[in-house]
Amino acid sequence: MKTQEELNGVKVPRPTDQRYSIALFFTDYFPKIPRLKFSLKGIISDGLPTTAPHLTRADSYVRQPAYKRVDVGLSYELVGKDYKPSSGLFSHFKEIWLGLDCFNLMDISNVSSYYWVTDVNDIQYAVPNYLTRRQLNVRLSASF
């Protein structure tokens, strides 16, 4: 949604001016192996405007780069309503899932914020702080 305001006769974007944001989540199971599920999540959104700490938005602003991310995951049902052992340790659980996820599959460097550095001439430069790049995650979830 495009949001802007007029400051001192100049139209500037508001701090929440994110013109687009698209997200997709898809999950499915494999027909031959119904206990194995696959999930895919994708996000792309416009960057937010930001201003140096000692300036006003009417003076100058920069826009962060677009945020892009794709996550994939596989989950395997170890114990469930159709696959419950009658005795032993696992018989006390309703469900147990073992999962493997790859966050930020494309290894994209997304900017979270900026660290502002001032030089001797009192000029400020935006140094980006990046979010975590590609990361693998193994999870075990259980319900009683």
List the predicted regions and their residue ranges.
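Gram-negative outer-membrane beta-barrel transporters
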Residues: M1-T51
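Residues that define the transmembrane beta-barrel architecture of outer-membrane proteins
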Residues: T16-I22, A66-V70, K94, T132-L136
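C-terminal beta-signal and adjacent terminal beta-strands/loops
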Residues: I43-P53, Y76-F144
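Outer-membrane beta-barrel transmembrane domain signature
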Residues: V62-D71, E77, F144
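Residues embedded in well-ordered secondary-structure elements
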Residues: P15, T27-Y29, Y61-R63, L89, ...
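Extracellular loop and loop/strand-boundary signature of outer-membrane beta-barrel proteins
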Residues: L7-P13, R57-V62, I123-P128
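Active-site/pore-lining binding-face segments in mid-to-C-terminal subdomains
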Residues: L55-A58, V62, V70-V72, K84
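Membrane-embedded beta-strands of outer-membrane beta-barrel proteins
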Residues: L24-F26, V72-L74, V138-L140
